[in-house]
Swiss-Prot record:
Family, as annotated: Belongs to the heat shock protein 70 family.
Entry function: Chaperone involved in the maturation of iron-sulfur cluster-containing proteins. Has a low intrinsic ATPase activity which is markedly stimulated by HscB.
Top-level taxon: Bacteria
Any one of the GO BP annotations: iron-sulfur cluster assembly
Gene responsible for this protein: hscA
Keyword line: ATP-binding, Chaperone, Nucleotide-binding
HAMAP family on file: HscA
Name of the protein: Chaperone protein HscA homolog
MF annotations from Gene Ontology: ATP binding; ATP hydrolysis activity; ATP-dependent protein folding chaperone; unfolded protein binding
Length: 621
């Protein structure tokens, strides 16, 4: 799929000109920026050659901010104003944040997204992330020597619409044009797939500082197709640090601790974890504010024991993603490890044991996502060279649908559909003279609207009054390449239209997604029975209402006995429709339908005679 770049007449770029675009890995622990230079993707370092930028921002009373290494160094003495792992807060409300009691920050539960009180005022996660992105943008422009046309920014595959929109808002605040948001595992697949020209099914296991993603990808003839995704947006290397911190506190009997001591021990815990990637044991030393000395020896065996449940927690989404993709572990050709946390020997062993093969680690796990994003950015900027023609297909994690009569869900876009995608379906009115229709946008796998997640509601007004069933309302669902959903409803006769862009106030946690999927499997039989019952009740209501209208307008076509019989059938349908037996409702509806056949024929005859009244035979010829 070649990309066509169109310029104004006389403004076409010279062949040697390149549009500067970068890939940014906006990470929980560290962030990176990369670009393609001389056809080779590379991570851009700071003035001291350091590739990683710690995702840390410290706010000062003079309303300035320190970003990166300097902020990280100051975190111990000023934990309340030094924000780390802000990615966990993107698009989240206060209720959505796990382990909030261990956080040193003063949170404000603002509408839509939490905020943090700092010495420089109240800051949102969007503003804090923008500080990091602006630093990376400046680094790139200083290194490349010109302004950027845009950036591809990576996000976890399980980021929902609110989290993705927050990321785009942060980029714009930082002065960056977002060319595309790209799933982190997919970015890694670009880096590995294109470099090695490999084809087949791959698993991308991405354990970063604060998020875990698993993607099952099929690479065939230059086409990247995501077969399934899964993960946990609240699980990462930070959780291993947190568990190790708890172990240190338990072993040294340290209670209570000040925020400064807590931050100091967290830094020591992280350093110990990283040291165990290179050696079998390490020593943890710290002097607390009280003068108390902490001196502990940590071995690989102890570390593996206290974090074993976290390692196993990553494998549950792996198993589910493989099931969704219909792939067995031995069918996976290779396993790509992404994220600094995958350097832990326990992770590499667990992944290797599960898939029965040694994971691929020939690219730096800290850099691979940024490199893939840079390659995608270079392509979107129109700089691709011959042989760089490839297509990228992502999927949505949960079905998107609309509520219909009876509280049922009509799925418009099924889960695991490739994005970008647009699907449309036509609906009609239920009552005579209906001039408005409520559109209820839903997400989930269940059959009833009450069991699915509500995303948005809006109304289409101005529908021309018609008999029930005559109006045609075309409802279009469109998911763009960034996973954002827009829904449009249009009445085809008049052209009246209404739409909504879905930006949920609160994010959807990954355990909620897993729960929704598990419930859909567990309740499948019950849901189908509930759907059948609801459908029969809707049909019963429709037929009874239509028959009642017919009696009101043409009841004189029936004898007293015939009308009594029809009304008795209607009463039976109404009574049985309150029950739970959809077979009985169906039978009663059929009986009413057949019992009014003669009435319908007489009404048709009257209608035809009325239409032909006063007209000559020659006029009909």
């Amino acid at each position: 799929m070649a990309l066509l770049q169109i310029s104004e007449p006389g403004m076409s770029p010279a062949p040697h000109q390149r549009r500067l675009a970068v890939g940014i890995d906006l990470g929980t622990t560290n962030s990176l920026v990369a670009a393609v230079r001389s056809s080779i993707p590379e991570v851009l370092g700071d003035e001291r050659g350091r590739a990683l930028l710690p995702s840390v921002v410290r706010y000062l009373p003079d309303r300035t901010a320190h970003i990166g290494y300097r902020a990280q160094e100051e975190a111990v003495r000023d934990p309340k104003n030094t924000i780390v792992s802000v990615k966990r807060f993107m698009g989240r409300g206060l209720r959505d944040v796990a382990n909030i009691e261990h956080s040193p920050y003063d949170f404000v539960d603002a509408p839509g997204m939490l905020q943090i009180k700092t010495a420089a005022g109240v800051k949102s996660p969007v503003e804090i992330s923008a500080e990091i992105l602006a630093t990376l943008r400046q680094r790139a422009e200083d290194t490349l020597g010109d302004d950027l046309v845009g950036a591809v920014i990576t996000v976890p595959a399980y980021f929902d619409e609110a989290q993705r929109q927050a990321t785009k808002d942060a980029a714009r605040l930082a002065g960056l044009e977002v060319l595309r948001l790209l799933n982190e595992p997919t970015a890694a697949a670009i880096a590995y797939g294109l470099d090695n020209a490999s084809e087949g099914i791959y698993a991308v296991y991405d354990l970063g500082g604060g998020t875990f993603d698993i993607s099952v990808l099929k690479l065939t003839q230059g086409v990247f197709e995501v077969l399934a995704t899964g993960g946990d947006s609240a699980l990462g290397g930070d959780d291993f640090d947190q568990r190790l911190l708890c172990w240190i506190v338990e072993q040294a009997s340290l209670q209570p601790l000040s925020a400064q001591d807590m931050r100091l021990l967290m830094v020591r815990a992280r350093a110990a974890k990283e040291a165990l990637s290179e050696s079998d044991s390490t020593v943890i030393d710290a002097v607390l504010e009280s003068g108390e000395i902490v001196h502990l020896t940590l071995t690989v065996e102890i570390f593996d024991q206290v974090t074993a449940h976290l390692v196993q927690k990553t494998l549950a989404p792996v198993r589910k993603a493989l099931r969704d993709a219909g792939v067995a572990p031995d069918e996976v050709k290779g396993v790509v490890l992404v994220g600094g946390a995958t350097r832990m020997p326990s992770i590499r062993k667990a992944v290797g044991d599960y898939f029965g093969q040694t994971p691929l680690t020939n690219l730096d796990p800290d850099r691979v996502v940024a490199l893939g994003a840079a390659m995608q950015a270079n392509l979107l900027a129109g700089n691709h060279a011959p042989g760089e023609d490839w297509l990228l297909l992502d999927v949505i994690p949960l079905s998107l649908g609309v509520e219909t009569m009876g509280g049922l869900v009509e799925k418009i876009i099924p889960r695991n559909s490739t994005i970008p995608v647009a699907r449309a379906q036509e609906f009609t009115t239920f009552k005579d003279g209906q001039t408005a229709m409520a559109i209820h946008v839903l997400q989930g796998e269940r059959e009833l609207a009450s069991d699915c997640r509500s995303l948005a509601r809006f109304e289409l007004r101005g529908i021309p009054p018609m008999v029930a069933g005559a109006a045609r309302i075309r409802v279009t669902y469109q998911v763009d390449a960034d996973g954002l959903l827009s829904v449009t409803a249009r009445e085809t006769h008049s052209g009246v239209e209404a739409s909504v862009t879905v930006k949920p106030s609160y994010g959807l946690a990954d355990d909620d997604i897993a729960r929704m999927l598990q419930e859909s499997f567990r309740e499948a039989e019950h849901d189908m029975k509930s759907r059948a019952l609801a459908e029969e009740r809707v049909e019963a209501d429709r037929l009874v209402e239509a028959t009642q209208r017919a009696l009101e307008t043409d009841g004189d076509l029936l004898s007293a006995e015939e009308r009594t019989a029809v009304e008795a059938l209607m009463a039976t349908v109404r009574e049985i429709a309150t029950g739970e037996d959809h077979h009985a409702i169906h039978a009663a509806v059929e009986k009413l339908s057949h019992g009014t056949d003669e009435f319908a024929a007489r009404r048709m005859d009257r209608s035809i005679k009325s239409a032909l009244a006063g007209r000559k035979v020659q006029e009909l010829g």
